[in-house]
Amino acid sequence: MIRRFFHTMGRQDRIYKTLSEALKTDKITLYNDSYKHSHHIAMKGVPDTNETHFRLEIVSPEFSGMSRVARHRLVYGLLKDEFDGGLHALQITSSKTPDEVS
C-alpha cells in the first residue's frame, strides 16, 4: 500500500519526501519552475512537462563537514530515480547546515 501511494504521488511530493527523510532536514523549500521551461526544445515530445524543473533550498545537519560540491552530489544521488524517470533539472540555490543558517 505504501509503495503504491509513493508511485501515485507527484514528483514534487516524492522529491520532498525523499530529501526530508534521507537528510533529516530542518528546512526544505522546493519551487516548481517547470512552467519557465515547458517551451524549450528539449521538452518537445516530453509527455508531461509539469514537473521537470525544480529549484531547491535545503538545511540539513547531514551536510556538516561536507563541501558544497559534496552536498550537491549527495542530493543528486538521492534523486537518481527521479532523474532517470524524467526530472530534467534541479537547481540547488542553497544547501546549508543549521549552524550556517544561524
UniProtKB/Swiss-Prot annotation:
Superkingdom of source: Eukaryota
Compartment(s) where it occurs, according to its Swiss-Prot or TrEMBL record: Mitochondrion matrix; Cytoplasm; Nucleus
Alphabetical keyword list:
Cell cycle, Cell division, Cytoplasm, Mitochondrion, Nucleus
Q: What is its main location?
A: mitochondrion
The induction text for this entry reads: Expression shows cellular growth phase dependency, with the maximal expression at the diauxic shift. Expression is rapidly decreased when cells approach stationary phase. By UV light. Expressed maximally (3.2-fold) at 4 hours after exposure to 240 J/m(2) of UV light.
Is the Hydrolase keyword given for this protein?
no
Q: Does the keyword Cell division apply?
A: yes
SUPFAM superfamilies, per the entry: BolA-like
The annotated consequence of gene deletion is: Leads to delayed spore germination and the unidirectional cell extension is not followed by cell division. Proliferates faster with smaller cell size than the wild-type cell during vegetative growth, but no other significant cellular anomaly, such as defects in septation or cytokinesis are detected. Sensitive to UV light. Shows a normal cell cycle delay after UV irradiation, but displays aberrant septum formation and defects in cytokinesis when released from the UV damage checkpoint. However, chromosome segregation is not affected.
Which GO terms are recorded in the biological process aspect for this UniProt protein?
Answer: cell division
Gene3D superfamilies, A to Z: BolA-like (3.30.300.90)
Its function?
A: Acts as a mitochondrial iron-sulfur (Fe-S) cluster assembly factor that facilitates [4Fe-4S] cluster insertion into a subset of mitochondrial proteins such as lipoyl synthase (LS) and succinate dehydrogenase (SDH). Required during the last step of iron-sulfur protein assembly when the iron-sulfur cluster is inserted into the target protein. Probably acts together with the monothiol glutaredoxin grx5. Not required for [2Fe-2S] cluster insertion into mitochondrial proteins. May be involved in control of cell division, especially during the resumption from cell cycle arrest.
Q: What is this protein called?
A: UV-induced protein uvi31
